[in-house]
């Protein structure tokens, strides 16, 4: 059909402008890798009173989120983080558009050794055998299948580097391989007054709502 886009759908999905096949790849993969050096900073928002989470804890229950690689018979853990506060906020609250800072904490994490990540941004996703829309598809089962494939195929990687579906900033999903190489440099309640101005700016920049200020 000349002059028209042809939509390919293998299963119901909101990523309707591209075809996302399940793994394994239909072509030879030539993966790209991205290394975060020792001392690199990652930011993470978590709920300290939920499931006994700490600043550096990996979630064992799942699969739930986009790149969860959990499977029966394996001790799998996942930790999601961003390189910026804006990435963390939109990843956590982008779906609702309302920043809920109650009971949440912001952790500043440092890597105690280099972290090797599979590059899924830009052409990286195609080099890995999929497409960049993998990071934004509403079909979580499909993206989880790919994460399990990446985890099994590349035992040297600590996780994946992908683009946030909300603002395309760099986001990280770390596998349990990186569980003991993260150090919490600092953590603050998300409603801490020192974060207030920055959160308001990010909320405005992303057309999100921020909660009223609290006294901390």
Describe each model-derived feature in a short phrase.
Residues 2-67, 97-216:
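Active-site and NAD+-binding cores of ADP-ribose-processing enzymes
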């Amino acid at each position: 059909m000349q002059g028209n886009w042809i939509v390919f759908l293998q299963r119901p999905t909101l990523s309707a402008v591209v075809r996302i096949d399940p793994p394994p790849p239909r072509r030879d993969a030539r993966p790209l890798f991205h290394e975060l050096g020792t001392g690199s900073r990652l930011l993470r928002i978590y709920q300290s009173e939920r499931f006994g989470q700490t600043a550096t804890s990996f979630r064992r229950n799942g699969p739930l989120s986009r790149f969860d690689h959990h499977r029966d018979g394996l001790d799998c853990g996942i930790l999601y983080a961003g390189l910026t506060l804006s990435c963390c906020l939109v990843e956590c609250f982008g779906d609702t558009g309302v920043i809920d800072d109650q009971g949440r904490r912001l952790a500043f994490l440092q890597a105690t050794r280099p972290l090797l990540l599979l590059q899924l941004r830009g052409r990286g996703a195609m080099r890995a055998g999929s497409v960049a829309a993998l990071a934004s598809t509403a079909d979580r089962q499909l993206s989880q299948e790919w994460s399990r494939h990446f985890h099994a195929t590349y035992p040297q990687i600590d996780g994946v580097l992908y683009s946030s579906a909300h603002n395309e900033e760099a986001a990280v999903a770390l596998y349990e391989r990186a569980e003991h190489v993260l150090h919490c440099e600092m953590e603050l309640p998300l409603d801490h007054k020192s974060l207030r101005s920055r959160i308001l700016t990010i909320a405005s920049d992303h057309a999100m709502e921020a909660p009223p200020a609290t006294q901390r």
